[in-house]
A protein has these predicted regions:
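Short secondary-structure transition hinges
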Residues: 96-136, 168-172
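Short hydrophobic/aromatic patch on the recognition helix
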Residues: 48-58
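Hydrophobic alpha-helical connector segments
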Residues: 67, 78-107, 122
Length: 201
């Protein structure tokens, strides 16, 4: 293969990666402003590409959301590892993990709904993301259960759904600044077998 031919073959891949990265940047801004139900065609227009280019990279909204959340996974993983490293009390560790999960689930307005629906849709790229979060929640939960700090019948999947419900309620029209701590307390008293003081944030 000649150098000229090689350069021609590399250029489309480079351009495609550049387009993909640019679309993700624009989509993050658009969803931050309009929520996850924002128009994909509007994202394409704002990115200066045709709808076909966007859909070649991201065939549907779930694929686009999964790509955006993938970019945030490093932060969530870092918080998980810090909790494991710094917190000795398994019940407090679970509490802090649920708080980190709640912050992740509120990255964009309306995000809890597609996350809630994803596990039931086996083909959704968000399903794998959710399963990873549930698996980690189970690990923290089981440690708290062994320590007597969480009720034995509670499941990680239920806590994950509870976090999504609280995250959704935070954005409800009737919610105010007192809603997040009140809702977190309600979730906490649902799983805790003894009183747990809210973690210092």
């Amino acid at each position: 293969m000649s150098e000229t031919t090689g350069a021609r073959e590399r250029r489309p891949r480079t351009d495609a990666q550049r387009n993909r990265t640019h679309i993700l940047d624009v989509a993050e801004q658009h969803f931050a402003e309009h929520g996850v139900t924002g128009s994909l065609d509007a994202i394409a227009k704002r990115a200066g590409v045709g709808p076909g280019t966007l859909y070649r990279h991201f065939p549907n909204r779930e694929v686009l959301l999964a790509a955006l959340l993938k970019a945030r996974e490093d932060e969530l993983v870092s918080r998980r590892d810090a909790i494991r490293r710094e917190v000795d009390d398994p019940t407090e560790a679970l509490d802090r993990w649920l708080d980190a999960l709640g912050r992740w689930a509120t990255a964009f307005d309306g995000l809890p709904e597609p996350l809630r629906a994803a596990p039931a849709e086996g083909t959704s790229p968000l399903a794998l993301t959710c399963q990873g979060c549930i698996t980690t929640t189970d690990e923290f939960l089981q440690a708290a259960q062994r320590d007597g700090g969480a009720r034995p019948e509670v499941r990680g999947a239920d806590l994950f759904l509870g976090v999504l419900a609280v995250s959704w309620a935070r954005g409800a029209a009737m919610a105010d600044e007192s809603s997040p701590p009140a809702l977190n307390t309600l979730l906490r008293t649902g799983w805790a077998s003894r009183a747990v003081e809210p973690s210092e944030r």
